[in-house]
Amino acid sequence: EPNSIWS
């Protein structure tokens, strides 16, 4: 995902 904040 390019804009993934969740790890």
From Swiss-Prot:
Main location: secreted
Tissue spec: Expressed by the venom duct.
Any one Gene Ontology cellular component term annotated for this protein: extracellular region
Residue list for modification 4-hydroxyproline: P2
Keywords: D-amino acid, Hydroxylation, Neurotoxin, Secreted, Toxin
Function: May act as a neurotoxin.
Record protein name field: Conophan vil-I'/vil-I'(O2P)
Organism: Conus villepinii
